[in-house]
């Protein structure tokens, strides 16, 4: 039985609570690792129904969180990330349906070969175990992480931001309902039942060996703390200082469409473009139309000296602007010396998240895609496609920007590791 959602008083009680949560999650992970795909899919189907049936309660809980956030004077970008709408709740349910429909990664034989001595060796996907997901303002992460971990046979411990506490609790209630309908343990998806920030430190310490991997979803300070203090492996989800480079060969109308979508579709998501780079050779044809379009669409443009000259509404860019994830209707813009200049700028200022080139020149595109060292690189497409759902994963637990184990959108398959199965017929080693 999981811990009740109650106020926690005192560090000793919190430590006991968190340790118990870890042990329960570890026990649930052993059950999930052996659960057949049909049982996991029954749970996912029940969760999808429960999210839709409980939409009013989820939205009511979210409205309370949003009201508190507004009273605290939070930014519009933060409020956008925090806010749920009927459409966003429906998207949550639809995401669960997609996850249910993807192939179960657990037990998949990824490679098989036979040795000269007759032994057969297989590499097989297996769950990671217990995943701790620490996130900030986005309540939908609770659903995404919960269902992806379930699909991949992992137990998950969710620790959402205090600002989204009620929303996460309402979503978690529906996920647990689905687990119960399928006969799976409640502790397969656990929500840390307190706003106490000390709970994060206990998670980072690994809960006495119960946590196998930590996934942080949030701003630079959260990710930095996790990477600094964690005693278990981390799938780092760094900030998205994302670039769109418009090459001299770019079709102007395509460039305008991509740049506008990459920046303004949703400014508060990690796939939003934060810097616009324009080929100096295209300055006379592409610069003014792109800058004017952005400003007329409500986006503040901060530019270098040349960019400032094309529209009096452009504000001067500071050195800090080239390294900033705004998550708001603000973009930095500058001219660069062709694709090589764009690559150098991204190397110096990017966050290895998502970067795009708009170009008709196939050689320029190939150079950009090959040399920009980011988890996601795009040719003639918006950076806002940096999303597990758009990759066909149904959802994502984060965008991993590191290079070990997982990179890019972390879906169900990326939440597995592997083991080797060896079949012999009495072989002994000479």
UniProtKB/Swiss-Prot annotation:
One of its GO terms (cellular component) is cytoplasm. One of its GO terms (biological process) is L-proline biosynthetic process. The keyword Disulfide bond does not apply. InterPro entries: Ald_DH/histidinol_DH, Ald_DH_C, Ald_DH_N, Aldehyde_DH_dom, G-glutamylP_reductase_CS, Glu-5-SA_DH, GPR_dom. Its main location: cytoplasm. CDD domains: ALDH_F18-19_ProA-GPR. It comes from the Bacteria. GO terms for molecular function: glutamate-5-semialdehyde dehydrogenase activity; NADP binding. It catalyses: L-glutamate 5-semialdehyde + phosphate + NADP(+) = L-glutamyl 5-phosphate + NADPH + H(+). Keywords: Amino-acid biosynthesis, Cytoplasm, NADP, Oxidoreductase, Proline biosynthesis. Its EC number is 1.2.1.41. Pathway: Amino-acid biosynthesis; L-proline biosynthesis; L-glutamate 5-semialdehyde from L-glutamate: step 2/2. It is found in: Cytoplasm. Pfam families: Aldedh. Belongs to the gamma-glutamyl phosphate reductase family. Catalyzes the NADPH-dependent reduction of L-glutamate 5-phosphate into L-glutamate 5-semialdehyde and phosphate. The product spontaneously undergoes cyclization to form 1-pyrroline-5-carboxylate. This is Gamma-glutamyl phosphate reductase. It comes from Rhodopseudomonas palustris (strain ATCC BAA-98 / CGA009). The gene is proA.
